[in-house]
Amino acid sequence: MDKKLKIRRGDILYVDMGEEYEGSIQGGMRPMVVVSNNLANKFSPVITVVPLTSRTYKKKYLPTHVLISEQQCTGLNRGSIALCERIMPINRSVIVERVGKVDDETLGKITEAVQIQVGVYEEYN
């Protein structure tokens, strides 16, 4: 990955999470949405992301899940779910490529779901 690539909030990245994984932590090549702010994305060696899954039929709905259709983004060839309960930092070194971006409305829903995950909304605590 080109270290000078400008990563922006809302970008969809392919990330190499390695072959080893445990439990619900997914390994291999994963699509992820960038949720960290653009100032951090510019200067930090770490990017905060939310993993995506295309297994929409297998997932129970949680308030931390955001459905993403192909029309709401570029770079995905099928509908996916942003798993915002799995927000995580990644090193830039594991980014393989930027493949697209979610639209502003979807990014707003992902932001709200991340806020639910970290306890911003009292009704979910």
Feature map (PLM): residue ranges:
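Hydrophobic alpha-helical segments that mediate membrane insertion or helix-helix packing
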Residues: 32-33, 110
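Short, surface-exposed secondary-structure edge patches
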Residues: 1-6, 23
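Short, charged beta-turn/beta-strand-edge "cap" motif at the junction between a beta-strand
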Residues: 18-22
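C-terminal terminal-subdomain/extension
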Residues: 5, 71-125
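Compact nucleic-acid interaction/catalytic patches
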Residues: 24-28, 34-70
